[in-house]
Design a protein with these regions (language model features):
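Hydrophobic residues in well-ordered beta-strands that form the structural core
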Residues: 115, 136, 193, 267, ...
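Short glycine-rich anion-binding loops that position phosphate/pyrophosphate groups of nucleotides
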Residues: 31, 162-166, 227, 364
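Short, solvent-exposed loop/turn elements at beta->coil junctions and helix N-caps
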Residues: 225, 305, 344-349
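N-terminal basic, amphipathic alpha-helical segments
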Residues: 1-47, 249, 253-260, 268-271, ...
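Conserved core segment of the aminotransferase class I/II
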Residues: 41, 215, 220-285
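Short beta-strand segments
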Residues: 27-28, 138, 159-161, 192-195, ...
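Conserved core of the PLP fold type I
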Residues: 45, 50-188, 198-216, 220, ...
């Protein structure tokens, strides 16, 4: 059994750095920037910049802008069944900062943090930064296998993406959620719930947040505006159980003081005026159409190479390669052609990795997706070496 943690972190981090300024096809986590309501957003930002009062030009508090915290709490109660008050909401610089705060508050050196396997390497990096030991827990069709988690008796916390698992895309079953909550209660452990891509389900109504099922106060809930609106906004949020709140506020204050108040105040009005809810509704249809375009293109051009894992939600889908295809080699050559998938093998920890690709579709039109899949097909043929490259269709 190979230990994948250092290699996977390095490979994933390198890929993210290389793609930092790219808008190329297959970019995971990139929303439909072409559909963002720029006029409404720009109008609000301009108005707040012109009328910015002195108190919003000074240092802000580590909890975040109170009107935004109230708007976030109201949205989460209505849309995600989260049990929270504005006092429990902390505004942070995206989900990665939220994970850093969870590690700083909840983990000590050598504590065990469990993660989904495969899962999100960015979470491993944040949780390992305090000296925590990362251990993978396998998945099945219902999500995290809690029976396997039971064997991690020293686990201090578990990080999960129950609404839309990254990278495989399944939702954690309700019965499995109850098992996980009982495990946390019984072991005095914490659950970090990253509500990744929860806004976009295509085949069914989403389950409410795991946090809303928690009667023991063991769940820390993470969300972000970066993927719903645009990544450069760098605003996200935590919902923290009351007994932990003071420690999280202190950690936030030590890490970065506060997030820009201009954007916080503009976002508050963006939500209050209904732009946010309308944008989410429009994007469900947009992403379903783009998902359909990618699935169709894969079936036409790559059905003999790729098996689609799950395509029921979100802004990406994952695929398994047929045996013998090196996903890292494919990703390197794809980057040279301006395509930016993620090698699925880099998402595995503490086990033999399986080869595949994570393909983002949120930021690309149907025409761009069709061209990108044709180019990817030729790249894979070149890597395999068994067939000549095919001309674009």
């Amino acid at each position: 059994m190979r230990s994948r943690s250092p290699e996977a972190l390095q490979a994933h981090a390198g890929t993210r750095t290389d793609r930092a300024q790219s808008l190329g096809p297959f970019r995971v986590g990139l929303p439909a920037l072409d559909r963002f309501p720029q006029k409404a957003w720009s109008r609000l930002v301009s108005r707040h910049a012109r009328q910015l009062p002195a108190e919003l030009m000074a240092y802000g508090g580590p909890r975040g802008h109170l009107p935004l915290r109230a708007a976030v709490a109201a949205y989460l109660r209505a849309a995600r069944d989260v049990r929270c008050e504005p006092s429990q909401v902390l505004i942070v610089g995206g989900s990665q900062m939220a994970l850093q705060l969870c590690a700083a508050v909840l983990l000590r050196a050598n504590d065990v943090a469990c993660v989904e396997n495969p899962g999100y390497p960015g979470a491993w990096k944040a949780l390992a930064a305090t000296g925590g030991t990362i251990r993978g827990v396998p998945l099945d069709g219902a999500g995290l296998v809690v029976r396997a988690l039971e064997r991690r008796r020293r686990a201090r916390l578990v990080y999960v993406t129950p609404s839309h698992q990254y990278p495989l895309g399944m939702a954690m079953a309700a019965s499995r959620r109850l098992e996980l909550l009982e495990w946390a209660r019984r072991n005095d452990a914490w659950i970090v719930e990253d509500d990744y891509d929860s806004e976009y389900r295509f085949a069914s109504r989403p389950l409410g947040a795991l946090q809303g099922m928690d009667g023991a106060g063991r769940v820390i809930y993470i969300g972000t505006f970066s993927k719903v609106l645009f990544p450069a906004l760098r605003l996200g949020y935590l919902v923290v159980p009351q007994p932990l709140l003071a420690r999280f506020v202190d950690a936030r204050d030590a890490l970065d003081l506060f997030s820009p108040t201009l954007y916080q105040s503009a976002l508050t009005d963006f939500i209050a005026q209904g732009h946010f809810a309308r944008h989410v509704r429009r994007m469900r249809s947009t992403y379903q159409n783009r998902r359909d375009a990618l699935v169709g293109a894969i079936h036409r051009a790559l059905g003999h190479r790729l098996e689609i894992v799950n395509a029921d939600a979100g802004m990406h889908l994952s695929t398994w390669f047929q045996p013998g295809i090196d996903d890292l080699a494919v990703v390197r050559r794809a980057a040279d052609r301006g395509l930016y998938p993620i090698a699925l093998s880099t998402c595995f920890v503490d086990s033999d990795a399986r080869s595949g690709l994570v393909l983002g579709f949120g930021g690309s039109t149907k025409a761009q997706i069709d061209r990108a899949v044709d180019a990817l097909s030729r790249i894979i043929d070149d890597v395999v070496g068994g067939r000549p490259a095919r001309a674009s269709r």
